[in-house]
Amino acid sequence: MGEPGHGDDIMSRSTQSAASEFAPTAALCEQHRQIRKLAADLTTMTQQSGFSDTEEFGRLRVAISRALQAHFEAEDRVLGHAMWSKSGMPAALLADWDRRRQRFRMSYSQHVRDWTLADAARDWAAYGRAVALCIGEGETLARFEETEIYPLTA
């Protein structure tokens, strides 16, 4: 989910490290890796000269939406109870995380509403810029989770 073409190897190593170090969140880190791969595929598609593959475009959008939904549900299952009930957890940090998650979810939902298939086809370059912004927001959230939130469950 990083900048197009930048940091993929670094992020993969970061995710692998987090997954091995914090066993309760290994599956969540793997989901981040899968979402990053889908995002990279969409980024590659948007960097092409024009909109051409309606089927692949639709498949990627659906796959990303499903992966994000599954990830948020998994976080709620894996982290929800442990994070909010464990004594000594920093309440301000958890509240910040909750706000960040909600902000990203709302932003992503708005992005999907704003960029229908027809809208993306009509202004492919602008769609590519919007995708890069959305992916950047998601990457910021994922890095925050991997460095600030997931380690709290260890």
Q: What is each model feature region?
A:
Residues 1-154:
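Small-residue-biased structural context
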